[in-house]
Regions:
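Asp-based, Mg2+/Mn2+-dependent phosphohydrolase catalytic module
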Residues: 2-32, 38-44, 48-163
C-alpha cells in the first residue's frame, strides 16, 4: 500500500489502468479521482480515455466510485449521466470520503485501488487509508500559479523518492 507520498504504481494515464492490470494486482474495486484523471478540470464530460476506461470497468464488472473534493453539483453533473456512484466534498487527503467510497464499493479494502493524479491529495489519501495507489499523469497541466507551484513540488518530491 502507498506510504506517505510514494504511490504503489504509476501510469501514463487512466487508459493504461486496464481491468487485466487491476485483476493481476488482485483489485476488484476502484476509487477514481475526477478532475485531471477522468476529465479535464471542471468538465462535465469525461475525456475520451476517461469514457473508454469507465466503459471497460463496467464491462469487466469492476465497480468504480468517483471521489472528489468538488461540490455535489459538480460531481453529480459528471457522474449521474454515466451511472457512476460518487462521493463529493471528500476531504482528500483525509479519510472521511475515502471511507465512504470503500463502504459504497462493498469490497475489502485490500482489494481496492485508488487512481488519481496528485501526490498531496490522492496518494496521501490512499496512504492514510492503506489502499493501493496508482498515480497517473494529469490530463492537462493547470496554468495557475498555485497549481504550477504544487506540480513543481510534486515533481521534486517524486524525484527524491525515486532516488
Amino acid at each position: 500500500m502507498a506510504h506517505g507520498l510514494t504511490p504503489d504504481r504509476r501510469a501514463a494515464g487512466i487508459r493504461d489502468v486496464t481491468p487485466e492490470y487491476l485483476r493481476d494486482m488482485g483489485v476488484c474495486g476502484v476509487i477514481a479521482d475526477l478532475d485531471n484523471t477522468l476529465a479535464l478540470p471542471d468538465a462535465v464530460y469525461p475525456t475520451e480515455d476517461g469514457a473508454a476506461w469507465l466503459a471497460s470497468m463496467r464491462q469487466a464488472g469492476i465497480p468504480v466510485v468517483v471521489v472528489s473534493n468538488n461540490s455535489f453539483a459538480r460531481v453529480e453533473a459528471f457522474c449521474r449521466p454515466l451511472g457512476v456512484d460518487f462521493v463529493h466534498k471528500s476531504g482528500k487527503p483525509f479519510g472521511r470520503g475515502i471511507r465512504r467510497a470503500v463502504e459504497k464499493l462493498g469490497v475489502p479494502r485490500e482489494r481496492i485501488a485508488l487512481i488519481g493524479d496528485q501526490l498531496f491529495t490522492d496518494v496521501l489519501a490512499a496512504s492514510h487509508d492503506r489502499i493501493l495507489c496508482i498515480l497517473t499523469e494529469p490530463v492537462v497541466m493547470e496554468t495557475g500559479y498555485f497549481f504550477r507551484f504544487k506540480r513543481a513540488v510534486e515533481r521534486a518530491v517524486g524525484r527524491k523518492r525515486r532516488e
